[in-house]
Amino acid sequence: MKDIKWNGSTISVEPTKKPKKLTGTHFPTIVGVNPFSSPFEVWCRCTRTYEIPFEGNKYTNAGQIIEPKVFDFLRYSMGFGDRVITPEDVYGKDHFKKTWGDFYPNTPIFGGMWDALIVGDDRKIECVVEIKTVQVDGRSGSLEERWKDGEAPHYQALQASLYAYLLGVDKVLMVAVVLKDKKGDYEHPEQVIPSYANENVYTDEFKATVYRRRTPGEWLFKCF
């Protein structure tokens, strides 16, 4: 944590030599569409003033265990086969340590990590895949409130759209795996099988440059 100087109702810090990049997680926050974070929190992180320590829990653990299952869902249930590219395919094992959590080293301001890619027959990238786990019996609202009509929440869609934009593609596929805490999905994520038959998967496909913002009256929102 850096030294902070209080100036009445504002603060100032010594500029950092190397600010942290804005990731897809933080991008929706700075444009005001993430209800779970604030622009000030992102500012503190990027200036290296302060960052909330990451602590793994049953929710993050479940996501890590289920993610490879979603890769198989993409390959077999959705029929993409060997067109599915994972971070391990590109960077090998321990890809986070190898890349420092940034798959866009040549981009000065924005960065982050995509979950998976879909390539065409020519092996060129066609689509960015963003994977989410959705709790339906928690405090953060029902599945219907967050994935209305099967569409991803705006802040999550914007996160995935940034990664697509940085890769120069316009197609995004969001995959949400529905988990029930009361059912024990978070305690035993290894038993969760994402499939349409199990009715525990939502998918939303859209273009990164123009998509519908979920507000009363619904209007088209240009991201970039």
Question: Where do the protein language model's features map onto the residues?
Answer:
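Secondary-structure boundary elements
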Residues: Y76-G81, I118-I125, A164-L173, D181
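Short amphipathic alpha-helical face segments that pack within enzyme cores
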Residues: K69, L158-L162
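Charged, glycine-rich intrinsically disordered N-terminal tails and low-complexity linkers that flank
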Residues: M1-F73, S77
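Active-site metal-binding core of divalent-cation-utilizing nuclease and nuclease-like domains
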Residues: T86-V128
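Metal-dependent nuclease catalytic regions and adjoining charged, substrate-binding loops involved
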Residues: G141-L143, K148-P153, L166-F224
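Short, glycine/acidic-rich beta->alpha junctions
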Residues: P108-G111, A152-L158
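Conserved catalytic cores of phosphodiester-cleaving nucleases, focusing on short active-site segments
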Residues: L74, W114-E145, Y163
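A structural signal for short, well-ordered beta-strand segments and their strand-loop junctions
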Residues: G32, V84-T86, C127-E130, K171-A176
